[in-house]
């Protein structure tokens, strides 16, 4: 439910600043090709205290593992072990990771295991999208949630006990070539595409390292001439990523989360002259039951029939907002807060202003 406090909180915390500050290149752009790679694998968690899986594939996986160790069970045997869980294991392989380095691993239950707390992940190969093994994972799980149940069926769950982590549980076995040391240029890709930011980035690099060092190919990418010797290229990029650049001011936007009622209004949002009337309709639904009782000795049966009553009422007085030409977001928020409206009211008002053409901003609903 939306409240007046959340509107005020939105006005205080969720307003973008109109002032642009210089930022480092490393905060504005990424180096093309220098990125993490996602890895995934399938494994088993053992040592659970009766909170494991009750699925056929967990049984099958356990039997397959036992067969690899020379323990052959008769066909059709079911282990029915409640201390084992089938899990998906995934991790991010950072750029430039070398063989032998450790990475963190996340483990998620695939079946109906109640909790992974106290479990140990057995050796699991982690593969990339190309099917090659890039890391091996194994270790004791750290689980933030818990699950407890009583003999009478009562149960309590805190957070998510079916997901855990193994810090440093993955060992890199194979490196990924980033192509960082190839070619005569380095490509910088802006995190937020903007022609002004790209131009300012080119100008800042050329001012620092000489004219013609950098040039923009579009609103997102900037090519920088760089030395080919790896040591020199690393030092060169170290200089570039610490150059300060003034980013361009983003276009006027209003972002609305229709599920939570969160509204973010950009600092450049303005409204043309407009008047808005907004009122709330309250729909009330009441359910009751009518009982039809036959007369004494009539031989009939008592009948119970549902009865529904619907009513539509207007809650509160109509709200009138009058905005002069060029009004800013401060005026909008103050006007809505003054009448004690909720974020839901503000959403409806902004949508109506956009439809009328009075709102000079992009309205984005997420």
Curated annotation (Swiss-Prot):
GO cellular component, one term: outer membrane-bounded periplasmic space
Molecular function terms, GO-annotated: structural molecule activity
Predominant cellular place of this UniProt entry's protein: periplasm
Keyword hit for Cell inner membrane: no
One Pfam family this sequence matches: FlgI
InterPro entries: Flag_FlgI (IPR001782)
Any one Gene Ontology BP term: bacterial-type flagellum-dependent cell motility
Similarity comment text for this entry: Belongs to the FlgI family.
Role summary: Assembles around the rod to form the L-ring and probably protects the motor/basal body from shearing forces during rotation.
Name of the protein in question: Flagellar P-ring protein
